[in-house]
Amino acid sequence: MKSKKKIFSVFAGLLVWGIASSCGAAAYYATIEQPSSASELIKSGTEFNVKPIDFAAISPKDLGYNSAEEWKTDSKPVPQAFADAFPVLLKEANIDNKKVKIISPDERVSKGIVVDVAVKSIILKWNAFAAQPDEFLCNVTFADAATSQKLFSAIINVNSRSGNPYAQAWGMSFSNRLQQAAYNIAWVLTKIIAQGKIDPAVY
């Protein structure tokens, strides 16, 4: 999707940030469904095998693409952005006793916990003036690698809001918003890895 680039002044960008922040724009996700209690096996787990984000349910035409090739071009940087997020997030959270490894979609592992994220729909809501992000409805699953026992399953609405409020107001391309959403999804997974669940409220 070829987004129209809008040029804003620094003042305008910061003004949008201020207005959006006052309206609660710091939310990066909302939980739709999850278990009532935390998974102790996830909390005590030390090895997490994370599969790339699954976009198989997404139709490029529904997002305004004229061809699958355009979608592939825009989404190509997403796997790397997703993988690169975990070392940063683990360090920020001071988590040094857990290892996160990115595995291929069909890779079979016998140790640790396998993490799957499938994006079921993308709701295009991005508005530069209001700093409103797109939304990614995700099915998140954690399973024991050895037994395939499901340890955690949730439906979480993760958005493409940037941690840099000025970048949010500046006018990101859809490819950049996809990468930002991937980072936010990794952030949600990091919280589950640490807590065995995710905070239920909009965060």
Predicted regions and their residues:
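A structural "domain/chain start" motif
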Residues: C23-D84, A194-Y203
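Surface-exposed short loop/turn segments
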Residues: A25-Y29, K101-L151, R161-N164, Q168, ...
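Generic short beta-strand segments
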Residues: P52-I58, A118-L124, N157-V158
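Mid-chain, structured segments of secreted extracytoplasmic proteins
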Residues: K76-P105
